[in-house]
């Protein structure tokens, strides 16, 4: 089971998930110089902050890659994101504002598709830039081995020799300059950013301090709605679903789900929709903090949840939410393709999402401020005539309700007996600090209690 390499495997092919940034640029040149045969794999995830994907493989070849490939992951990424949406697989929230697990969705796709591409090139050693303190090292480990059980793992940031020689940005920059190489030097920010078509994650550095917040973040998927100098006009948008699939925005149908997501991002981004600030538990149980953007997914989720609430009954919605919380944790932990996740996903997609057909019209204002203006669906079980307060023919009568309330008396009596028992044992009452008070039970209620059995 010793598939984690702590030293560079000289003379062997090593696949590197290559971003084109300073760290992977220095790593790929260093690996070649030390005798390994580096292969470069770059995932096109629709990152909103990447201007030229085609340039990345060219830089990898310049820095010493034996072969450099660009893998278009957008279609699969959108499909997995819609599956998460349909399942409500979002377990992290603060006061009802969700983190939409956009990075875990991206890792599920990257971790499998890049390793599959490596197998095509007979590359069975994989490296990437994840560190030992984060979630990604475990996510990539799991997904990589699912895609290739013969995979071995080499991460430069687990190799002490690499750390000693190139352990910081200053050392990596000096290394590249000393070898006459240019590289993509990102602007030094007060935090780090990772993104894909579904969302952006901002964390680390200054954002590790809870007295720093969203106001230091420059969003990459929309406007900074918290800034007073940013003008945002209200906008009405209509979202259509067919059998759980988002298919139209503002009555424009999209045959390509990728284009629909891009348009949803543009619409939501104009308002700063889907920004959240979360404290969360990493896989290793230590807490971290992130500020997230997900404008398109937030927009689709508003419409999807509205239709769920109007179409399904209370017990189905409750189970959908319970399963979604569990599935969200599994997704976060890198278990999106485990059997327990597949079971929960299939349940939601079959029995919840397939009924979700209809349109929702929303007015977007600033940030996460919105109003739902209209909801239509052929599958709505919301029927106002059943409960209308206006005079007219009713689906049930006052006598029907009297009968229903009479039946309720059975469990009310049982509940009262339990409360009296709790008072008698001291669980309730002034001494327990509980404010619940009950009238004393009448000495003779005139009703004989049935014998206990």
Swiss-Prot record:
The superkingdom listed in its UniProt entry is: Bacteria
Q: Which GO terms describe its biological process?
A: argininosuccinate metabolic process; L-arginine biosynthetic process; urea cycle
What SUPFAM superfamilies does the record point to? Adenine nucleotide alpha hydrolases-like, Argininosuccinate synthetase, C-terminal domain
For binding L-citrulline, which residues are annotated in this chain's numbering? 99, 135, 139, 192, 201, 203, 280
List the PROSITE patterns.
ARGININOSUCCIN_SYN_1, ARGININOSUCCIN_SYN_2
Q: Which positions in this protein are listed as binding ATP? A: 17-25, 43, 129, 131, 136, 194
Cellular compartments per GO CC: cytoplasm
Compartments annotated for it: namely:
Cytoplasm
Q: Which InterPro entries match?
A: Arg_succ_synth_type2_subfam (IPR023437), Arginosuc_syn_C (IPR048268), Arginosuc_syn_N (IPR048267), Arginosuc_synth (IPR001518), Arginosuc_synth_CS (IPR018223), Arginosuc_synth_type_1_subfam (IPR023434), AS_cat/multimer_dom_body (IPR024074), AS_multimer_C_tail (IPR024073)
So, what pathway does this thing act in? Amino-acid biosynthesis; L-arginine biosynthesis; L-arginine from L-ornithine and carbamoyl phosphate: step 2/3
What Gene Ontology molecular function terms does this protein carry? argininosuccinate synthase activity; ATP binding; protein homodimerization activity
- Grouped into one coarse class, the protein's main location is cytoplasm
Q: Mind telling me which Gene3D superfamilies this protein's record contains?
A: 1.10.287.400, Argininosuccinate synthetase, chain A, domain 2, HUPs
Query: Which EC class, in a word?
Result: ligase
Assembly description:
Homotetramer.
Which NCBIfam families does the UniProt record give? argG, PRK05370.1
Family (UniProt)? Belongs to the argininosuccinate synthase family. Type 2 subfamily.
- Record's protein name: Argininosuccinate synthase
Q: Which organism is it from?
A: Solibacter usitatus (strain Ellin6076)
């Amino acid at each position: 089971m010793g598939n984690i390499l702590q030293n560079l495997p000289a003379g062997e092919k090593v696949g590197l998930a290559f971003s084109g940034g300073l760290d992977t640029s220095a790593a790929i040149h260093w690996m070649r110089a030390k005798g390994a045969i580096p292969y470069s794999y770059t995932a096109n995830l629709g990152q909103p902050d990447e201007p030229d994907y085609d340039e990345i493989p060219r830089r990898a070849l310049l820095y010493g890659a034996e072969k450099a490939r660009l893998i278009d992951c957008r279609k699969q990424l959108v499909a997995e994101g819609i599956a998460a949406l349909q399942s409500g697989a979002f377990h992290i929230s603060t006061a009802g504002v969700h983190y939409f697990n956009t990075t875990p969705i991206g890792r599920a796709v990257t971790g499998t598709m890049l390793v599959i591409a490596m197998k095509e090139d007979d590359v069975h050693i994989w490296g990437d830039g994840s560190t030992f303190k984060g979630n990604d090292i475990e996510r990539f480990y799991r997904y990589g081995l699912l895609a290739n059980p013969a995979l071995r793992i080499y991460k430069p940031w687990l190799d002490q020799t690499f750390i000693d020689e190139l352990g910081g940005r200053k050392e990596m920059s000096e290394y590249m300059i000393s070898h006459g190489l240019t590289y993509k030097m990102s602007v030094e920010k007060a935090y780090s950013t990772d993104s894909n078509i579904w969302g952006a994650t901002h964390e680390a550095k200054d954002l590790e301090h809870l007295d720093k917040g969203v106001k230091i973040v420059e969003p990459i998927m929309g406007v900074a709605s918290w800034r007073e100098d940013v003008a945002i006009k209200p906008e009405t948008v209509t979202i259509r679903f067919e059998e759980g699939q988002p298919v139209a925005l503002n009555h424009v149908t999209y045959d390509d789900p990728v284009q629909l997501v891009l348009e949803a991002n543009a619409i939501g981004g104009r308002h700063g929709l889907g920004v959240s600030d979360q404290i969360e538990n990493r896989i290793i149980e230590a807490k971290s903090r992130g500020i997230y953007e997900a404008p398109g997914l937030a927009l689709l989720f508003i419409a999807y949840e509205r239709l769920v609430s109007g179409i399904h009954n209370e017990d189905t919605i409750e189970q959908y939410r319970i399963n979604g919380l569990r599935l969200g944790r599994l997704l976060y932990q890198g278990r999106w393709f485990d059997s327990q996740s597949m079971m929960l996903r299939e349940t939601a997609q079959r029995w919840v999402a397939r009924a979700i057909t209809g349109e929702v019209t929303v007015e977007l204002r600033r940030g996460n401020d919105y109003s739902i203006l209209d909801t239509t669906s052929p599958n709505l079980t919301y029927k106002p005539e059943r409960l209308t307060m206006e005079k007219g023919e009713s689906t049930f009568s006052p006598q029907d309700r009297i009968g229903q309330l009479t039946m309720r008396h059975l469990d009310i009596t049982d509940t009262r007996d339990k409360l009296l028992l709790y008072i008698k044992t001291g669980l309730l009452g002034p001494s327990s600090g509980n404010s619940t008070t009950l009238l004393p039970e009448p000495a003779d209620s005139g009703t004989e209690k049935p014998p206990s059995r």
